[in-house]
Amino acid sequence: GSKTFITTTDGNHGRGVAWTANRLKQQAIVYMPQGSAAERLANIRAEGAQAEITDMNYDDTVRYTSELAQKNGWIIVQDTAWDGYTRIPLWIMQGYMTMALEAYEQLPVKPTHIFLQAGVGSLAGSVQGFFADIYDSSCPLTFIVEPKGADCIYQTAAANDGSLHSVTGRLETIMAGLACGEPNSIAWEILGNLSDGFISCPDYTAAQGMRIL
């Protein structure tokens, strides 16, 4: 039968949902947070999805998307978890491990350090978990890196009180794909237990990195 899949994205995740729905001859609806690039919006629409940029930040857009899904009986495909919604995010995190495996298979030597970017922490948690499983007690030192304007994982680690901590507001950063203010609860269970450090970076560090690369 006909299904409608709905999601919030900064770009790549939503494009993947749109592509998959199109191949399955189903409908995809994609919402993007304020500040999302017009080119990314166009790429998602090119996959046949109904897509638009909201005037909300990422986390508020996720809540809006969830409300629409519940109201209309649509299937929400989100890469972050919350109370009562964990199965699909877990599947997505398991899928992210494919990238970790591909990187691992191409490593000429064992790395000494691993730096992982984090938005809600899903990708970082997946990669951290993969390498912790591969290397066990000899896992490379692993650091989680976030933009200073949206450093919810860093704030949760700094508080160290057993609770998740959010960052609110516009979440302004040039690191658009990482402009997320609320941690994925599943990812934090991994990151909080296995990561060696957490780094909150001002935008100029990302700009300098892009110039170097």
Predicted regions and their residues:
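Short, structured coil segments at secondary-structure junctions
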Residues: 24, 47-48, 72, 138, ...
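Glycine-rich phosphate/pyrophosphate-binding loop at beta-loop-alpha junctions
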Residues: 64, 83-193
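Generic beta-sheet signal
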Residues: 31, 54, 79, 145-147
